[in-house]
From Swiss-Prot:
GO MF: manganese ion binding; RNA binding; RNA-DNA hybrid ribonuclease activity
Catalysed reactions, semicolon-separated: Endonucleolytic cleavage to 5'-phosphomonoester
Organism in which the protein naturally occurs: Lacticaseibacillus casei (strain BL23) (Lactobacillus casei)
Entry GO CC: cytoplasm; ribonuclease H2 complex
Broad class of enzyme this protein falls into: hydrolase
Binding, a divalent metal cation: D74, E75, D165
Subcellular location, record wording: Cytoplasm
Cofactor: record remark: Manganese or magnesium. Binds 1 divalent metal ion per monomer in the absence of substrate. May bind a second metal ion after substrate binding.
Annotated RNase H type-2 domain residues: 68-252
Lineage: Bacteria, Bacillati, Bacillota, Bacilli, Lactobacillales
InterPro entries: RNase_HII (IPR022898), RNase_HII/HIII (IPR001352), RNase_HII/HIII_dom (IPR024567), RNaseH-like_sf (IPR012337), RNaseH_sf (IPR036397)
Protein name: Ribonuclease HII
């Protein structure tokens, strides 16, 4: 009879023989029952993730019948008082299997785990940035459009079609706009993760350059700590002067 440690090693394999599972089921040891239960939970979780991934790739699978290269686009940072809007365009391979989802539904740790896998396995990734001066000059919506067009232009493989989270990208390509696209498309979800990780890291860098605003935690959003910093220290070069609280501080 295998030891529990041997069973544990066998259950960690990519494929587990039915005879192993049958033997575990017949094993009267409490530890054997726990190992089997844990394995079954992992299998159920994996099956659920596969179903969810298939659901979130339904738009890609529809388009892949016509287009080889479909890019998903998303933005991060339209609402903050400071920092840029960051956009990403991602073309995924048809066999992509990582459980990407709306970046807002993931923890920072989960995003940081998925981020390198997206960069490594994607066919192409493009980044666009609209800084606070562009946002103040163009308005936030148009600045985001420009950053999305920039992200498409930075793809090393030209996309044939775009999936976009509820916006129009000013480029001459077929595009489908999806409401809550980052929760309904793996390509948009991957783009949201890439954009979020890049912007968060940028704001953490700005926190060191401009201490006193808590950028490392609020990422430029108008939190109590950020507003207190704005009142105490004034407006930094990365603040959006067209946004109400910043504009009010400039007038005070």
């Amino acid at each position: 009879m295998p030891t529990l440690s041997e069973y544990k090693a066998l259950l960690a394999a990519d494929e587990v023989a039915p005879t192993i599972l049958a033997a575990l089921k017949e094993d009267s040891r409490i530890g054997a029952g726990k190992l089997l239960a844990a394995y079954q939970r992992r299998q159920a979780h994996q099956a659920a993730e596969e179903v969810a991934l298939r659901y979130r790739s339904r738009y890609e699978r529809q388009l892949w019948g016509t287009y080889e290269y479909v890019a998903g686009l998303d933005e991060v940072g339209r609402g903050p008082l400071a920092g840029p809007v960051v956009t990403a365009a991602v073309i995924l391979p048809h066999h992509f299997q990582w459980p990407v989802n709306d970046s807002k539904q993931l923890t920072a740790h989960e995003r940081n785990v998925l981020y390198p896998h997206i960069l490594t396995e994607a066919i192409a990734v493009g980044i666009g940035v609209a800084d606070n001066r562009t946002i103040d000059r163009e308005n936030i919506y148009h600045a985001t459009e420009l950053a999305m067009a920039q992200a498409v232009d930075h793809l090393r493989v030209a996309p044939e079609c775009l999936l976009v989270d509820a916006m129009h990208v000013p480029v001459d390509l077929p595009q489908k706009r999806l409401i809550k696209g980052d929760a309904n498309s793996i390509s948009i979800a991957a783009a949201s993760i890439v954009a979020k990780v890049i912007r968060d890291r940028l704001m953490m860098m700005y926190d060191k350059i401009y201490p006193g605003y808590d950028f490392k935690d609020n990422m430029g959003y108008g939190t109590k700590a950020h507003l207190a910093g704005l009142a105490a220290h004034g407006v930094t070069p990365i603040h959006r002067r067209s946004f109400g609280p910043v504009r009010d501080r400039l007038r005070s």
